[in-house]
Curated annotation (Swiss-Prot):
One of several proteins that assist in the late maturation steps of the functional core of the 30S ribosomal subunit. Associates with free 30S ribosomal subunits (but not with 30S subunits that are part of 70S ribosomes or polysomes). Required for efficient processing of 16S rRNA. May interact with the 5'-terminal helix region of 16S rRNA. This is Ribosome-binding factor A. It comes from Chlorobium phaeobacteroides (strain DSM 266 / SMG 266 / 2430). The keyword Cytoplasm applies. One of its GO terms (biological process) is maturation of SSU-rRNA. GO terms for molecular function: ribosomal small subunit binding. InterPro entries: KH_dom-like_a/b (IPR015946), RbfA (IPR000238), RbfA_dom_sf (IPR023799). Belongs to the RbfA family. Keywords: Cytoplasm, Ribosome biogenesis. Monomer. Binds 30S ribosomal subunits, but not 50S ribosomal subunits or 70S ribosomes.
Length: 116
């Protein structure tokens, strides 16, 4: 990634985090914007979110974000329009890094128990 795309991704991550917290409060699972990856032409922003909750809550939250992405983009545009000529299209994905890390930790604990 170039320096520009990194700066854009960082700005989008901060703003989207605030938007999701303030403009779209939902009771239920905790939602965190973990990472944003922007294409070189700044046309698409892939937003990776971490959802802490049951599997159904996670799926419902991602589905909700996909349905609301036009509204989220509109709010984002009103907040950062002076930075961009065109606001990137948003694509939401669930970040599964924490689940993978938890699984690795469980496996390591099992190995340690077997060695004792």
């Amino acid at each position: 990634m170039s320096i520009r795309t990194e700066k854009v991704a960082s700005l989008l991550q901060q703003e989207l985090g605030m938007i999701l917290e303030k403009e779209f409060p939902r009771g239920g699972p905790i939602l965190t914007v973990v990472e944003v990856k922007v294409t070189a032409d700044l046309g698409i922003a892939k937003v990776y979110v971490s959802v802490i909750g049951s599997a159904k809550e996670q799926a419902d939250t991602i589905e909700y974000l996909q349905q609301e992405k036009k509204n989220i983009r509109k709010i984002l545009s009103s907040k950062i329009r002076h930075h961009f000529r065109r606001i990137p299209e948003l694509e939401f994905y669930q970040d599964r890094l924490y689940e993978k890390a938890d699984r690795i930790e469980q496996l390591l604990k099992e190995v340690r128990k077997e060695q004792e």
